[in-house]
Amino acid sequence: MWKTTDLCDEFENELQICRQPFRSFGKKEQFHGKIATVKVKDDNVLVKEGLQTLPEGTVLVVDGGASTNCALLGDNLAAIAEERKLAGIIVNGYVRDSSELKNINIGILALGTMPNRSVKEGKGERNISLQFGQVEWKPDEYVYVDEDGVIISDKSLHR
């Protein structure tokens, strides 16, 4: 079993440490996987498309610009991720249906909750580098999450 603290000790100069104040909403507190990215503004159509097409074990990283206008993820989309065996979802934005999310067996990080839904226009970008939390999130790199933090590596560290 790995811990972010141990990975930081062992690979100190090879990691990025995210400094975004995320809250955990999913059932899993610890998760890791290959990164896939989506950048959106108050629109979760590309989030849904990503969840429906990404391979098992992936972590979808959603940059919603920390917008407080709406939630980008709720129980329906999280259930798709669970059904498809994704490792987790990290949202630089907000979620809703938090009481249901805690029973969904994936990792879910977000800034907080917002009760209203997003627009459905399909605007945004996929598979691009994102920057938030003082780190760069690149597709096909690896993210490790537990109760102590979020770290990113350009290679798999999990043994």
Curated annotation (Swiss-Prot):
Q: Where does a divalent metal cation bind?
A: 97
Q: Does the keyword Lyase apply?
A: yes
This protein's cofactor list reads:
a divalent metal cation
What is the cofactor note? Divalent metal cation.
> Which pairs of Cys residues are joined through disulfide bonds in the record?
none
Reactions catalysed according to its record: 4-hydroxy-4-methyl-2-oxoglutarate = 2 pyruvate; oxaloacetate + H(+) = pyruvate + CO2
Q: What is its EC number?
A: 4.1.3.17, 4.1.1.112
Q: Which UniProt keywords apply?
A: Lyase, Metal-binding
Which residues take part in binding substrate?
74-77, 96
Q: Name one Pfam family in it.
A: RraA-like
Report the NCBIfam families cross-referenced here.
NOT-MenG (TIGR01935), PRK09372.1 (NF006875)
Q: What is this protein called?
A: Putative 4-hydroxy-4-methyl-2-oxoglutarate aldolase
Q: Which organism is it from?
A: Bacillus anthracis
